[in-house]
Amino acid sequence: MSVVVEPAQTVDVVDTARRAAKPEDLRAADGRVPGRRGRATRQRLLECTAEMLRTTSYRSMKVIDIAREAGTSPATFYQYFADVEAAILVLAQEMAADGERLVRLVAEGNWKGRAGYRTALELTDAFFEFWDQHRPVLRVVDLSTVEGDRRFRNIRVRLLNAVTIELAAVVAAFQAEGKNQGVEPMAQAGTLVTTLANVAAHHLGFEFWGIRTADVRISVARQVYWGTTAQRPPTPS
């Protein structure tokens, strides 16, 4: 996934996740709030859409195929989503809300000394895991963003900006201690988050070039640690 971080736009991912859980956000296409069975049907349709995205181009996906996979009818699908793209948009929104775990890792991690390097490793692992888990949806987000769809573009900005802002706060905290001088915190954090996201998106491609993911992981973590703290990373054991 090619990544563009846009620091000017800030979004609270935690707040997004909370709002995503509200029943009124699960309204059917006719405006009604579905009951328990309706919510279960809607969730099953989303799960089937996500599963089909792993093996099928989203442009080739048809409502009838998703409905059949979910054990229901196209008419039922249209009760909840206007079209396939609308269902994928919901999956993308849920994916962005799940990005709060990346924000939490940055905010709660200890960035000093060897503990800081462990935090950088954990953040790198979390990015790799996040991209592997959400890769089918992220592909659609990326393609739709390139094509100018602002809905998907805003989701991508929301996901990456939240991490960037939190990491910039860590850089600024080191600067307040007289360390990591000479860099603008948001620019530094944006560069590091872009590296994390792009490498996470393409680490499987490195394997085809004979570059092990384990080695890529260490390389990225060392860059993140050095860029955040301005301290030399510890020598790998």
Label the model's feature ranges:
Residues A86, V90, R104-Q133, P185-L192, ...:
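Hydrophobic alpha-helical connector segments
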Residues L46, L121, D125, N161-A172, ...:
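An amphipathic alpha-helix signature
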